[in-house]
UniProtKB/Swiss-Prot annotation:
Gene name of the encoded protein: Tmem87b
Ranges facing Lumenal side: 43-216, 270-300, 345-351, 416-429
Reported function: May be involved in retrograde transport from endosomes to the trans-Golgi network (TGN).
Ranges facing Cytoplasmic side: 238-248, 322-323, 373-394, 451-555
UniProt-listed PANTHER family: LUNG SEVEN TRANSMEMBRANE RECEPTOR, TRANSMEMBRANE PROTEIN 87B
Name this protein carries in UniProt: Transmembrane protein 87B
Length: 555
């Protein structure tokens, strides 16, 4: 959730409240912001695979974005052969420029295998950037203790290969940075032979098992983890220095910082684990997604309660807080489902697509809530002429506007580069699609931290009942006026036959006596002291009243 940006400091708040067209445009921009990925787009690419292959299996296909000079190792860990069998194992390494090339390669190769056709893989790729090697006459029988080693003889003479551990299993080496497809085809002389192989494939680059597209993302998570640690230390120092003046909103900020630090640490540990072992720990990934869902939910709630003026304009949110928490719980549930299903079933799973739609709708509600609340809060502060708090929210609004504009520009760029491009070749920039949103929120968070930081002037931003309740003065005055008139009796008037009202007494002294007996002294002396007139005003009013009574007598 969540978004923010800078503009003209003095003009923006007035534009938000005075220009409906501009407000509608901002609302549309905020709604567009919701249709963006909320977390890591997919599971990191593996670097180590184990497969079971038998006489009925088709070619094995592996895809990965690799650095130049990445070593591909292939070995048979265990085997089972019904009789003497001679194997021919071919491997094909294909470099391709576009990430979206050959989406149906696995299905086509399986169909050719079922038709017992001998597929020429490099011919399928038109022999462009495709390298083929093979090992022939590999004997396997029930008496064999070990499967013959596999290696590419063309690579054994290269410097430093013989000194590396497991170099005898190196069957291919990449020559470029980019997208690669590695295909393993296992054949036997006897088509009716029964056999079973348990094979292992690893791809080790200059930095480890991690792919070329995930390497920058791992560094990014490490840097962001350090950034959040610095955020936490800075916030802790601020809070320790001014712990007596801590506001309630500042506890929310501390919770978001802690969850952000935990989220980045868990994701970094998962990427580091893949880089070290080549395998992904599904439980760790699920835990990371759940932490990410909690953090994103709390981050959205933080922006909402800041926009509502919690602790700044209002001492409590009342029933509005129930709606905010309910919306947050709804988002948390669907965000957790989306993250777990993406780890288990992949980003194209039906449940992931449906939850993405629901999350987009909930995010739209969040954005609408934030926009309406922020506009109302700034309007209230402007009416109260509270320049200190108004300046605070003006800077916060400018930050949100900046983030909205930055998000729109980024979405246009990613759509053009990764979504609708015929050739998705910018693999070096894939990590930006995931990292941008985390970086953008960290910018919003540091702005919120700076604006709402603990300081000696904390109480200038805190809710002050004697000052901030001015918008309720009219209502309170009406209630007080009703209570003050409870002890006042209405003076009855007599009417004559023609319906004309007649004074109850012709004597002005009797009228004054009636006032003294029926109007409580507390009303004039205590409740409304400002209504007590001076002696001169009383004499003037008495003369006017006498003239009115005299004119009525004459009539």
């Amino acid at each position: 959730m969540a978004a923010a940006c800078r503009s003209e400091a003095g003009l923006l708040p007035s534009l938000l409240c005075r220009r409906p067209a501009g407000a509608q445009l901002l609302r549309v921009a905020l709604c567009l912001l919701c249709w963006v990925p909320a977390a890591v787009d997919a599971v990191p690419e593996l670097g180590l695979w184990t497969r079971t292959v038998n006489d009925k299996s088709g070619p094995l296909v592996f895809r990965k974005t690799m650095f130049n000079s990445t070593e591909i190792k292939f070995s048979v860990k265990s085997f089972s052969c019904s009789g003497p069998v001679k194997f021919t194992i071919e491997w094909h390494l294909k470099y391709h420029t576009c990430h979206n090339d050959y989406p149906d390669l696995e299905e086509e190769l399986s169909q050719r295998h079922e038709l017992h056709a001998d597929p020429d893989v490099c011919a399928y790729f038109k022999n462009i950037d495709c390298w083929t090697t093979k090992s022939e006459n590999l004997d396997c029988s029930s008496d064999s203790q070990a499967f013959p080693s596999l290696n590419n003889k063309e690579l054994t003479g290269i410097r430093n290969i013989s000194s590396q551990e497991g170099s005898t299993d190196v069957v291919a080496r990449t020559q470029k940075d980019g997208f690669h497809i590695f295909i393993v085809s296992i054949k036997t002389e006897k088509t009716d032979a029964v056999w079973d192989l348990n094979v292992s494939l690893s791809m080790v680059g200059p930095h480890g098992y991690i792919s070329a597209s995930d390497w920058p993302l791992m560094i990014f998570y490490m840097v962001m983890c350090i950034v959040y640690i610095l955020y936490g230390v800075l916030w802790l120092l601020w809070s320790a220095c001014y712990w007596k003046d801590i506001l309630r909103i500042q506890f929310w900020i501390a919770a978001v910082i802690f969850l952000g630090m935990l989220e980045k640490a868990v994701f970094y540990s998962e990427y580091q684990n893949i880089n070290s072992t080549g395998l992904s720990t599904q439980g760790l990934l699920i835990f990371a997604e759940l932490i990410s869902a909690v953090k994103r939910t709390l981050a959205r709630l933080l922006v909402i309660i800041v926009s509502l003026g919690y602790g700044i304009v209002k001492p409590r949110l009342g029933t509005v807080m129930h709606r905010v928490i309910g919306l947050g719980l709804l988002y948390l549930i669907f965000a957790a489902i989306e993250g777990v299903m993406r780890v288990i079933g992949g980003s194209k799973h039906l449940a992931v697509v449906l939850t993405d739609i629901v999350l987009a709708v909930i995010d739209s509600i969040f954005v609408w809530f934030i926009f309406i609340s922020l506009a109302q809060t700034m309007k209230t502060l402007r009416l109260r002429k509270n320049t200190v708090k108004f300046s605070l929210y003006r800077h916060f609004t400018n930050t949100l506007i900046f983030a909205v504009l930055a998000s729109i520009v980024f979405m246009v760029w990613t759509t053009k580069t990764f979504r609708i491009a015929k050739c998705q070749s910018d693999w070096m920039e894939l990590w930006v699609d995931d990292a941008f949103w985390s970086f953008l929120f960290s910018v919003i968070l540091i702005v919120i931290m700076f604006l709402w930081r603990p300081s000696a002037n904390n109480q200038r931003y805190a809710f002050m009942p004697l000052i901030d309740d001015s918008d309720d003065e009219v209502e309170e005055f009406m209630v007080t006026s009703e209570n003050l008139t409870e002890g006042i009796k209405l003076r009855a008037s007599k009417t004559v036959s023609n319906g004309t009202a007649k004074p109850t007494s012709d004597n002005f002294d009797e009228d004054l006596k009636w006032v003294e007996e029926n109007i409580p002294s507390s009303f004039t002396d205590v409740a409304l002291p400002v209504l007590v007139d001076s002696d001169e005003e009383i004499m003037t009013r008495s003369e006017i009243a006498e003239k009115m009574f005299s004119s009525e007598k004459i009539m």
